[in-house]
């Protein structure tokens, strides 16, 4: 997994403002399933891995499995390999990964053209929304990780304490309900979930 990048308050605020203006689309994509849920989770997991977010990668592995993503597809997503996917699915994954690697800048022209071959303008807008939302969550969780690193005496280069405290506090509040949801929805016993999270923490 590549190195994770923390967020700054101004950058995250700008991302949040874009998402706030698109709340009706959020309701359609997540609430009403306008974008195929399996494809949505494949894209979100690919973006989480591109952004090196261990927390989001862990959580979205569980959601992806629930939506029918196979273990082989999970492995291919994390290795950025195309052979496990049809051309349409891979066009979305590769495009989203490129956007994540470019800090939400444009993807290379060939990826933009390939995406347009398989998705209409409305679908491309939905994929953009998913990529933006996942990136905002990823960099927030990475900033929480930067705070944990600072507390262990290993501050992350170019990461500011004020960003870590403000953003990390929000992430810390979100972790317990997400963990509870995973325990109930995925029927993961608390002891197993705690062991997996400890392993995740030790990997940092």
Question: What spans do the regions from the language model cover?
Answer:
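Hydrophobic alpha-helical segments
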Residues: 1-204
